[in-house]
Regions:
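Canonical AAA+ ATPase core
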Residues: 1-34, 40-43
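Conserved RecA-like P-loop NTPase ATPase core
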Residues: 5, 28, 42, 74, ...
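Alpha-helical scaffold elements adjacent to nucleotide-binding pockets in ATP/GTP-utilizing enzyme cores
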Residues: 19, 23-27, 45-49, 81-84, ...
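Short, flexible turn/loop "capping" segments at secondary-structure junctions
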Residues: 22-26, 59-61, 114
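Conserved C-terminal "switch" segment of AAA+ ATPases
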Residues: 34-100, 183-188, 192, 218-228
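Terminal C-lobe "cap" of eukaryotic-type protein kinase domains
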Residues: 107-108
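Soluble catalytic regions of large protease machineries
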Residues: 115, 120-126, 132-294
Length: 294
């Protein structure tokens, strides 16, 4: 019997509702696990598919960027992105371009573009440039940054994938916290405290809080604690108040460092934001060029 499935064999990832019946599994003599493609394999597929369609004029930079930004995605998704880009190009009566491919990946993952007033884009450009600069300073090269609004976000920064990194140090995780806090920190540095207090940083604060709590309670990286507990477990114990206070203390310390970081790199953040307002999005090489030249 030969078969293929995307379902979990034991339900450990998706839960028992997606588990294959053990009675069926017993009929197979052998099981072959096929992982999702890594970055190099995604790049090879994109090159092959575009060449097959006669679209071999797409730049190496665009193909590498798409491959780097699709960690954890299947070949089928990459094919869907290419097809979407080609349909959009046909509707517009233009040739398939790198810009169309980048836009198609955004549309496939997050939906149609939304339009807002200019003042909003200026704020988002500073916010996302802050994220990109903090990630760059932490050694996680930003691979893409955009101020185009889709879904439930106004823009976003995506850093270089970490497929080949087996573990993280405490400083690595603090760098991630600073990167999450850098959007609000940049708005505060450029526009003042009151203007920075908006709902745009809510998901960033959730991410920073979760990471800070894991540094303190889960990964054994706090001087006062070696107990390994998840954030959910902590909140259900008598230690909740203590851990929340320590988490908040760590976040405040990192926010102060992040504000200092943005102040010291103000010219780079401003230059990146200016370019974002001109182009709406930037790839890794474009971001690196701006930071190198400023």
């Amino acid at each position: 019997v030969l078969a293929a499935t995307n379902y979990d064999l034991d339900g450990s990832v998706s839960g028992k509702k997606r588990r294959i019946d053990p009675a069926l599994l017993r009929r197979f003599d052998n099981r072959i696990y096929v992982d999702l493609p890594n970055e190099e394999e995604r790049k090879q597929y994109l090159e092959l598919k575009l060449n097959q369609k006669g679209k071999n004029k797409i730049s190496e930079d665009i193909i590498s960027n798409l491959a780097a930004r699709t960690t954890g995605q299947s070949i089928a998704i990459l094919q869907n992105v290419i097809e979407l880009a080609m349909r959009n190009a046909a509707k517009a009566g233009t040739e398939l371009s790198g810009e169309r491919l980048l836009d198609a990946l955004e549309e496939y993952n997050y939906g149609e573009k939304k339009t807002w007033e200019q003042g909003y884009y200026e704020s988002v450009a500073i916010h996302e440039s802050g994220h990109a600069y903090a990630a760059w300073c932490a050694g996680e090269k930003p691979s893409y940054v955009t101020i185009v609004s889709r879904g439930n976000f106004g823009g976003y920064m995506q850093h270089e994938n970490s497929e080949n990194k087996p573990n993280y140090s405490r400083e690595d995780l603090l760098g991630k916290i600073r990167t999450s806090l850098a959007g609000r920190a940049a708005e505060k540095v450029f526009f003042g405290r009151e203007a920075s207090l908006n709902t745009g940083a809510s998901s960033d604060l959730r991410s920073a809080t979760d990471m800070a709590m894991r540094v303190i309670a889960t990964y054994g990286m706090d001087e006062e604690n070696l107990v390994c507990l998840s954030p959910e477990q902590i909140l259900n114990t008598t230690l909740a108040k203590e851990f929340i206070e320590r988490t908040n203390r760590l976040l405040k310390e990192q926010m102060k460092e992040t504000e200092n970081l943005i102040c010291s790199g103000r010219e780079k953040v401003e230059a990146l934001a200016k370019k974002l307002l001109e182009q709406n999005h930037l790839t890794q090489n474009e971001i690196q060029d701006i930071f190198d030249e400023t």
